[in-house]
Amino acid sequence: MTAIHSLTALDKAHVLADALPWLQKFRDKIVVVKYGGNAMIDEELKRAFAADMAFLRTVGVHPVVVHGGGPQISAMLKKLGLHGEFRGGFRVTTPEVMDVVRMVLFGQVGRELVGLINAHGPYAVGISGEDAGLFTATRRTVVVDGEPTDIGLVGDVTEVNPDAVLDLIGAGRIPVVSTIAPDADGVVHNINADTAAAALAEGIGAEKLVVLTDVEGLYTNWPDRSSLTSSIDAGALAELLPRLDAGMVPKMEACLRAVRGGVPTAHVIDGRVPHAVLLELFTGEGIGTMVTPSAASDGVVPA
């Protein structure tokens, strides 16, 4: 028996009543959710995430999903006999790897998520950064051991044209965005889903960015588990970034970009927890780590 089934009818009513302030706070607001990690591998977590997105839409929140596909891309590369390599937390993307990335993100991962959400109603529509000029990318390098390092067809989002996403939101749909994007010359690049989610959240005026991870939140001194922090401001995070584990850097860079770009708060949450997004949005306790633009000077901490 699951915990929800063990609740009495009165308990369930209290849960709904307690959520009312948060339902009011986020009604008609855009929440960008970066979907990745274990939440997109485990079948139960996939279904729970899809149900969460349908729930948000049903109660008047406007979710926008930006997804990665790292495990699926790695599996397909292995199946095709192609070598996969990471540098500085980013996948090295040759033209051959880019073909696989494009195929897997939009043709496999995105389609599956759209189908799971649409099991709850005709809500989700899949698009990519190539569609309607949503994203324009610029090729990036990463710093590895203090040296700038080429990682191939990997880009940063430098321009966002939000019209297509806003049109879908206005039509009551849930945009599901695959993170591939052309540069100014039309050359398609692999965009890290964390950084793409941050750029999109900034570009469409989101109320919140939520990034799913495979850890409880941000550890300021990993692997010391007592260093898990529930909140951090942009200045402190910027100082901490050079000392973070490589896998967390893109996620925390994304949160930093979002809040510096006008998004009120960004959160990294544990995607291994079923319904983690609902826990973050609709409970006073929240979950994971919240990033704010600056230290609250008035004692008020954003939700």
Swiss-Prot record:
Pfam families linked? AA_kinase
Give the reaction(s) catalysed: N-acetyl-L-glutamate + ATP = N-acetyl-L-glutamyl 5-phosphate + ADP
- Does the record's keyword annotation contain Iron? no
Q: Where is the signal peptide?
A: none
Q: What is its main location?
A: cytoplasm
Q: CDD domains under this entry?
A: AAK_NAGK-C
Q: What does the entry list under GO cellular component?
A: cytoplasm
Q: Which residues bind substrate?
A: 69-70, 91, 190
Q: Which domain of life does the UniProt lineage start with?
A: Bacteria
Residues the record annotates as the site (Transition state stabilizer) are 34, 251
**Record pathway:** Amino-acid biosynthesis; L-arginine biosynthesis; N(2)-acetyl-L-ornithine from L-glutamate: step 2/4
Q: One GO BP annotation here? A: arginine biosynthetic process via ornithine
Q: What is its EC number?
A: 2.7.2.8
The record's subcellular locations are: Cytoplasm
Listed GO MF terms: acetylglutamate kinase activity; ATP binding
Q: Which UniProt keywords apply?
A: Amino-acid biosynthesis, Arginine biosynthesis, ATP-binding, Cytoplasm, Kinase, Nucleotide-binding, Transferase
Record's family?
Answer: Belongs to the acetylglutamate kinase family. ArgB subfamily.
- PANTHER family tied to this protein: N-ACETYLGLUTAMATE SYNTHASE (PTHR23342), N-ACETYLGLUTAMATE SYNTHASE, MITOCHONDRIAL (PTHR23342:SF0)
Protein's job: Catalyzes the ATP-dependent phosphorylation of N-acetyl-L-glutamate.
- Can you name this protein? Acetylglutamate kinase
According to its UniProt entry, this protein's organism is Nocardia farcinica (strain IFM 10152)
Encoding gene per record: argB
